[in-house]
Amino acid sequence: GKNYLATVPKYDGFCTVPNHLNYQKEIEGFLNLYEPIEHKPQQGEFSHIQSLMRHIFGEQYELGMDYMQLLYLQPTQKLPIVLLVSEERNTGKSTFLNFLKAVFENNVTFNTNEDFRSQFNSDWAGKLLIVVDEVLLNRREDSERLKNLSTTLSYKVEAKGKDRDEIAFFAKFVLCSNNEYLPVIIDAGETRYWVRKIDRLQSDDT
C-alpha cells in the first residue's frame, strides 16, 4: 500500500486553465481541471460542418466562423450570449449544440433552466461552453444573472458540503428556444446577446 501511494501524483491544489494549443495537465504544482480535446485542426474540406455553420449563421457566416476560432484559440475571451430561436421543428439548433460538444468534448456541458437557478454550480462553472437546448429564463433575476455571468471575470463556485471558492470564469453561453418572443428578457439597447432566427432545414444531411 505504501509503495503504491508513493507513485500517486501530489498537487498543491486545483486550477482551471483552458488552452487548446499547449494544454498542460499540471501548472506550477496545481492540477488543471480543464480537460484536453483530442481534435487538431487540419487543412481540408469540411462540407458538412460548413453547411451547418452557413445554416445557423446565414449572412453572418464569417462572424460564426470567427466565433468558433476564438473559442479554440482564445478560450478566455468574453463573447456574446448566442441565442438561437425558431418556432419550427427540425431547424438544426440541437445539431449545432451537439457539434460544439463534439469539438470541445468534456469542456461543454448541457444545462437545464433549473441548473442556472441552483446555488450549486461546481459541475459547470469551469466549462468553456454552457449550452441549453430549451431555454426559458424569462424572470428578471434569470436575465440579470445570465448577463452578469457573460461578462464577469471571476465567479464563486459552490458544491454541496464544501466551502465556496472563487475561480476565473470564462464560460460562454449558447441557448436555444422554440419560443421566439420571450425565452429570456432582453432590454432595448442590450448588446450582450447575439440572436439568430433559424429556418427549417432543407435536408437532414447535417
Regions found by a protein language model. Give the residues of each.
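Long, basic/Gly/Ser/Thr-rich N-terminal segments
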Residues: 1-29
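Conserved ATPase-coupling elements of RecA-like P-loop NTPase cores
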Residues: 138-143, 185-186
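Conserved catalytic/switch belt of AAA+ P-loop NTPases
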Residues: 143-165
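Walker B catalytic acidic pair
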Residues: 133-135, 145
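Short glycine-/polar-rich loops that comprise or flank the Walker A/P-loop
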Residues: 125-128, 152, 169-172, 188-194
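AAA+/SF3 P-loop NTPase mechanochemical coupling elements
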Residues: 120-125, 158-176
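A short helix-turn-beta junction within AAA+ P-loop NTPase domains corresponding to the substrate/partner-engaging
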Residues: 184-203
